[in-house]
A protein has these predicted regions:
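N-terminal FAD cofactor-binding segment of flavoenzymes
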Residues: 51-93
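A conserved short coil-to-beta-strand element within the FAD-binding core of flavoproteins
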Residues: 138-155
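Glycine-rich FAD pyrophosphate-binding loop
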Residues: 30-54
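Short beta-strand to alpha-helix junction loop
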Residues: 65-69, 101-127, 272-278
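N-terminal Rossmann-like FAD-binding beta1-loop-alpha1 element of flavoenzymes
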Residues: 11-38, 348, 352
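Flavin (FAD/FMN) cofactor-binding core of flavoprotein oxidoreductases
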Residues: 280-323
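Central helical "cap/lid" subdomain
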Residues: 46, 54-59, 168-228, 292-294
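Active-site substrate-recognition segment that forms the wall
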Residues: 212-270, 277, 281-290
Length: 354
């Protein structure tokens, strides 16, 4: 059950970021009777639990799957039936640096799930009531948090949108940042809110280059799959950490598509390389690992500057009741999808119980 609102708790709240943490936080606050506005700079919700749409089908180029360990996460998922399905963990292999299978399957038999028909189906479903109520501002980047010009006890947000348009949203009792740690820290410092940002200084998050490949010509009656018979693998190749056959996921189209995620170390080393160079190097590594030498009809890379938490904050969230500023995200406690959910939930509970 959502917490019973405290008389002193903030009633009009801004949540910056519409990833899993932001949506979990916002929906919990709405359920407790708060007015919430979510600001998201992208044109869709989901954050790293998002999908890329192409002419050859979708690619889950961020989070690849999620697991469920916290009962509260399981309860929240139950409110969005049909938006996720199990993805067989027995298909996941562990490869040596040359692409040979070193372990037949992951040691853990923990169920793996994916959004259906896209990875962002779960956050999209959770956000639906907020969107329908006009509580989500997509394509809106918050550039500064400052005290409300008309009421110094409240906050206002300076924002930018399409075509360099600017707008001020005001009257917030609390502002909650559900952003990657580096982005949250930068926004707080740009807003002269260094006290909260300093608490994030020790957090470390690694980047990740993601490669998307499509082989539509592989769809032949006598050809079941192209390349390896496994559908997903953890790789020890120096460039590649993960590979997944997108068409093996439930609800996806049959076009042969692969998502490849570079290793944290390689991604960091080549973080500022141009996309063409990264694509060529990762494609070469993909061929070495899978044995697939065919030329893809589609190839594209995407750079996640903040992908996997290396050193978490060590607590579920940050909340300053006195100022009305808070922050949440997977970086607080880990790097899993569920970690983002738990962090957003815990921040909402703390705000509601103020």
């Amino acid at each position: 059950m959502p917490p019973r609102p405290s008389a002193a708790a903030p009633k009009n709240i801004a949540v910056i970021g519409a990833g899993i943490a932001g949506i979990a936080c916002a929906r919990t606050l709405v359920q407790s009777g708060r007015k919430v506005t979510v600001f998201e700079q992208d044109d869709q919700v989901g954050g790293r639990m998002s999908s890329c749409e192409t002419a050859f089908g979708t690619f889950d180029h961020g989070a690849q799957y999620f697991t469920v360990r916290d009962a509260r996460f399981a309860q929240a998922l139950a409110t969005a039936p049909g938006s996720y399905k199990p993805w067989s963990a027995t298909a996941v292999r562990v490869l040596d640096p040359h692409g040979r299978v070193a372990e037949a399957a992951l040691r853990s038999r923990e169920p793996h799930f994916v959004g259906a028909p896209r990875m962002d189906a779960v956050p999209t479903e959770w956000a639906r009531p907020l969107v329908e109520a006009g509580g989500v501002e997509l394509g809106t980047r918050v550039t500064r948090i400052e005290r409300d010009a008309l009421n110094g006890d409240r906050w206002q947000l300076q924002t930018s949108g399409a075509g360099d348009t600017s707008h001020v949203f005001s009257g917030f009792d609390a502002v909650l940042l559900a952003l990657p740690c580096a982005a949250a820290r930068a926004l707080l410092r740009a807003s002269s809110q260094s006290a909260l940002s300093k608490k994030m200084d020790d957090v470390e998050v690694a980047p990740c280059w993601s490669l998307k490949l499509a082989f539509p010509n592989a769809m032949q009656p006598t050809l079941c799959t192209l390349g390896p018979q496994w559908n997903a693998a953890l790789s020890t190749h120096h460039r590649i950490a993960w590979l997944a056959r997108e068409s093996s996921k439930p609800g996806r189209s049959a076009v042969e598509r692969w998502t490849v995620q570079a290793s944290p170390a390689w991604s960091q080393e080549h973080l500022d390389d141009d996309e063409a160079t990264v694509l060529a190097k990762l494609h070469k590594a993909f061929a070495e690992v899978t044995g697939i030498r065919a030329q893809p009809a589609f190839a594209e890379v995407f750079r996640w500057r903040n992908a996997k938490t290396v050193k978490p904050l060590g607590q579920p969230m940050l909340w300053e009741a006195g100022s009305g500023l808070g922050a949440c995200g997977d970086w607080c406690i880990g790097h899993r999808v569920e970690d983002a959910f738990v962090s957003g939930l815990e921040l909402a509970l703390a705000v509601a119980r103020r």
